[in-house]
Amino acid sequence: MSPPPTDGIDLALQHVGVRFGGLVALDDVSLRVPPGRIVGVIGPNGAGKTTLFNVVCGFVPPTSGSLTLDGRPFRPRPHRLTRLGIARTLQGVGLFPGLSVVENVMAGATHSARAGFAAALFGLPRSDRDERRLRHEALGLLAELGVAAHAAAPPATLPYAVRKRVALARALIARPRLLLLDEPAGGLSAEDITELGELVTALPDRAGGACSIMLVEHHMDLVMSVCHEIVVLDFGRVIAAGTPEQVRDDPLVTEAYLGADVPAGATPPGPGAGS
């Protein structure tokens, strides 16, 4: 018998469709996020990226098709994701204003601390040992992401780029085998995006626990620099899939971003469009 995978979850979507009344948001979408790989999902405004992310997170049920995790049927439920080894970051950082940075990160691990920080938050009996362990782990993640100096600060006092890293640390403390990133470059400067790319590239092989990554993003340069494979959506359908080089050279991708009347050799723009 083969050993269980230790380098990430194998996520697959087969012929997924989503309809909102007469509107087709996703149409026959199939993709795979193999263990330990970074797969990007891009597309122009209205392509269906956000809907796809919401399907995987369990916020939107598919009208047709199926999902699997490690080859087993998967029906996403938002409240069950962490138990399945899945963590996510959202477009907004969503930090708790009444907690310090390190406490925000600790809150991301409450599903695994049976009598720890979560209990302390809600006035329930707790284990001091669990809380000390979580705090130590949270501080380590903040150091890994270069923001340990802000551990005691309230989130509202920090630059947006720092808060984005705190949100990433909060996802990582759950030790996910699959990490879902929803437009992590949104609102960041060019320098911040470059640094973010370096962080994301290292995540599948990090010492603290490897993971697979699905990156939904509109910033073309980031996607091209960090992803092993890219899936391109347009009007809810997959129009291209492959390596960054294959996608960059695909005429359908160029047409989707720039229109039909484009010069030969034109490439999609860096920032791209929204969801």
At which residue positions do the language-model features occur?
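Catalytic Walker B motif of ABC-type/P-loop ATPase nucleotide-binding domains
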Residues: 179-183
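Helix-to-loop junction immediately C-terminal to a conserved catalytic motif
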Residues: 57
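The feature captures the beta-strand-to-loop junction immediately N-terminal to the Walker
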Residues: 42-44
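Hydrophobic anchor residue at the start of the ABC signature
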Residues: 168
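Conserved catalytic motifs of ABC-family nucleotide-binding domains
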Residues: 175
